[in-house]
Amino acid sequence: MMSERIFLASPHMGGSERRYVDLAFDTNWIAPLGANVTGFEQDLQQYLGAGYVTALSAGTAALHLAVRLAGVQRGDRVFCQSLTFSASANPIVYEGGEPVFLDSEPDTWNLDPETVEAAIARFGVPKALIAVHLYGMPGKLDAIRSLCDAHGILLIEDAAEALGSVYHGQKCGTFGHYGVLSFNGNKIITTSGGGALVCRDEADAQHALKMATQAREPVAWYEHTELGYNYRMSNICAGIGRGQMEVLEQRVGQKRAIHDRYRDALAGLPLQLPAEPEDVRSNRWLTAALLAPDCGVTPGQIIAALAEHNIEARHIWKPMHLQPVFRDCAFVKTAERSVAEDVFARGVCLPSDTKMTPEQQAQVCAVIRGLF
């Protein structure tokens, strides 16, 4: 008999979500407006401690609006971290921009500041730069922001995987001109599907809200002076989010405990888990391991072995510059071998579901140990 499925990451309800969802039904506010949407935005804004929050239908919608607000137009270059999910880069192309993909640094696997400098020297100042906090680990934000400030580059902070992560005492999602959050079903909290845009300036937040509601002008008839989108979050989904916010810090603690158990149980094996830099708290959304070169075991073998036990694991994100859809885009690296390519070749994402018990995690570790 097949054992109970152990997921990579799945929705984990806290218990109070239904109360907020029932509120939407009781008041008949089922549309993408209402008390839950407003309340969820306020909860997020209070938690982040900075910025103006607009709840949206997806993290991708938030990224698209950020690219719009940055003024990206056809032919504009936008620098983007290559080691990420495709949603980080797709909105650049939505607006006719040209992605220039940048390599990672080996410490956090995030955007390499030296590569940013090399890209500026090669291509000039971009219209914007998209930096990602991979698997919840904050990137080298001080260096990246310093470069952006020095060259007048708009920073879009893709914190889709990093809600609850903290860099030098400041919450991730609040460092850029625009910050992006995701509440997809696999994220640290979920609204089923959803995202949020964090704007530094209130005027930008108001403009984002306008674009997210079809860019309708405030007149008696339907009038539009710019393109808009149907990107607003449902009041029902926002109700789930309000309940999830009540357990966010608990989920961060659980994710970090999962990472620590992997660190202890897999000690001595030829693999490495990324360490937190000083004065950084990762939410450890997914624990990812980097296998030693020539260790005799591949990520694919680990994934296949775990799958035999009904356990889900996955490869690291395939870098964007290796994706067929972006084959004509430039890629910049400073190391002889691309860090992003190396991490993709040797990395594996381990089950990090907050509903996974310590006993189930011990089973995961036993399967992995059995391969070495």
Regions flagged by a language model, labelled:
Residues 78-79, 92, 99, 155, ...:
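A short hydrophobic/small-residue beta-strand
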Residues 84-89:
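Conserved coil-to-alpha-helix start sites within the AMP-binding
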Residues 107-191, 196-198, 203, 298:
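Active-site phosphate-binding strand-loop segment of PLP-dependent enzymes
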Residues 95, 150-151, 309:
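Helix C-cap/helix->beta junction micro-motif
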Residues 33-77, 91-94, 101-103, 170:
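Phosphate-binding glycine-rich loop
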